[in-house]
Amino acid sequence: MTVIDLESYEDALATYDPVMGLEVHVELGTKTKMFCGCSTELKQDANSQTCPVCLGLPGALPVVNEIGVESAIKIGLALNCEIAEWCRFARKNYFYPDMPKNFQTSQYDEPIAFDGYLDVQLEDGEIFRVQIERAHMEEDTGKSTHVGGATGRIHGASHSLLDYNRAGIPLIEIVTKPIEGAGARAPEVAKAYVAELRELIKALGVSEARMEMGQMRCDVNLSLRPHGREAFGTRSETKNVNSLRSVERAARFEIQHRGVALDLETGGTIVQETRHFHEEDGSTTAGRIKDNAEDYRYFPEPDLVPVAPARDWVEELRKGLPELPRLRRARLKEEWGVSEHDMQSILNAGAVDLIVATTEVGAPADQARKWWMGELARNANETGRALDELGVTPAPVPAALRFRPGAPPFRLSASAAGFPGPWSRRRSSRRCGSAAAARSPPSTTASGVCPVPACRPRASCRRP
Amino acid sequence: MPGITREEVAHLARLARLELKGEELDHFAGQLDDIIGAVARVSEVADQDVPPTSHPLPLTNVMRADEVRPSLTPAQALSGAPAQEQQRFKVPQILGED
């Protein structure tokens, strides 16, 4: 990779205002694809989930997935958007084999949801309102593998192999209006926005929105405008930034990189381009020069009829919206009596829903919080897993806590809950079938899964 | 009506990844002009009161329940592929992209 000169972050901001646009793609959790009945389940068996529609075979006719439309409306409503009374799909034509149809079915000038906003909370508690341009329905592309190149990248590859299992999986693309006025906090705003959006999507139940699994992907568009000028600079678009931390890093990197590029250009314009984000060092490198929107030769999709959501359906969906995550967090923080800092730790650990579920089965909030935020959180962190991937479920926790109404508060530890004492320091063994476990087998959960986080279940863990 | 220019043909050719020689650009500019001229005649009969349409039938909201239907087998899916490898469609090197 070529070494790029970077301007210091402070120098770039002394001259320019960053203007950001964030595009987030959310893969919906529907059972079937957007326009055909193929399953969306992740399968390793290549091209096992395709049909004439998603392969673009002649004569095949797409029909839109009702849950896909419903999910789009829910997302639109939760983002305070207007919901179109009538809208159409459009073909986005481009020359790339990841869609066998040679176009992507998307929406162009008639998105299903538009003109909304999302309030996000920054680390110091300040609320920043991000204006939403639109949320529209489209479909995911197939997966390409490039063969023959040294690094598996397109460059230098002799040919490419295509698996179309993912082609046609419903996507909702959520596009912000230009985010201005964030100044040095632009990267923080970007991260907070994507984090809030992820919580919202999960609360709506339309997707698990796991970024590490590509269920939610972010493109960071950034341009720099000299202080006091009206016009936006030419933007760069950093594609597929796939973690919250990376969203922040990519924005920061581009501010520094754009700063250098602009300083070099006498006219103050740089080419509109797609950039690739590198997880290893947080840098971005140039990709293709972007086609203009007109180059995609969008036109209304003649194979699909317009979508005209009935107003009573929209209002019914509005009534069913869950409590907004930001407000729910504020309420829970109040109810649990925790500090802003502790609440942030709970959020970062992904423990909110687990603690709520644990209180719902009868544990007091403070003990439920300590249960999840103690050794379990530490173990999850050390083993690089999510708290809900440890095989521990909330249901048996009250029993494990030996909670009895009126009982004196007790000191919580893993061993007190019947776990072998040293498990958290025995990560190398990777299972609990140790001598300690054999003497005192850990209580299994209702599902029979060993509740010991570091355990790779073996027969010995599941003795009757 | 403005004619299709040589530059526009060259741009379209780039989008379609077609390599055209100089004389071909002129040739196709003329042909595309004729085609667009023919289609433009529609505007002569379609007055302001006829809205543009993308579908011949006045239908909306044709939707499908979210129920899984059987897919093709990989062998069936690949049966029309000019080339395949590792149960995947094999395509030539993708030029000019990264």
Curated annotation (Swiss-Prot), chain B:
Keyword field contains Magnesium: no
GO biological process, one term: regulation of translational fidelity
EC number assigned by the record: 6.3.5.-
Alphabetized Pfam families for the sequence: GatC (PF02686)
InterPro entries reported in the protein's UniProt record: Asp/Glu-ADT_sf_sub_c (IPR036113), GatC (IPR003837)
Region annotation Disordered: where it falls in the sequence: 75-98
Molecular function as annotated in GO: asparaginyl-tRNA synthase (glutamine-hydrolyzing) activity; ATP binding; glutaminyl-tRNA synthase (glutamine-hydrolyzing) activity
Organism domain of life: Bacteria
Cystine pairings recorded for this chain: none
Keywords on record: ATP-binding, Ligase, Nucleotide-binding, Protein biosynthesis
Reactions that this protein is recorded to catalyse: L-glutamyl-tRNA(Gln) + L-glutamine + ATP + H2O = L-glutaminyl-tRNA(Gln) + L-glutamate + ADP + phosphate + H(+); L-aspartyl-tRNA(Asn) + L-glutamine + ATP + H2O = L-asparaginyl-tRNA(Asn) + L-glutamate + ADP + phosphate + 2 H(+)
Subunit structure: Heterotrimer of A, B and C subunits.
HAMAP family: GatC
Similarity annotation: Belongs to the GatC family.
Free-text function comment from the UniProt entry: Allows the formation of correctly charged Asn-tRNA(Asn) or Gln-tRNA(Gln) through the transamidation of misacylated Asp-tRNA(Asn) or Glu-tRNA(Gln) in organisms which lack either or both of asparaginyl-tRNA or glutaminyl-tRNA synthetases. The reaction takes place in the presence of glutamine and ATP through an activated phospho-Asp-tRNA(Asn) or phospho-Glu-tRNA(Gln).
Protein name in the entry: Aspartyl/glutamyl-tRNA(Asn/Gln) amidotransferase subunit C
Species per Swiss-Prot/TrEMBL record: Streptomyces griseus subsp. griseus (strain JCM 4626 / CBS 651.72 / NBRC 13350 / KCC S-0626 / ISP 5235)
Gene expressing this chain: gatC
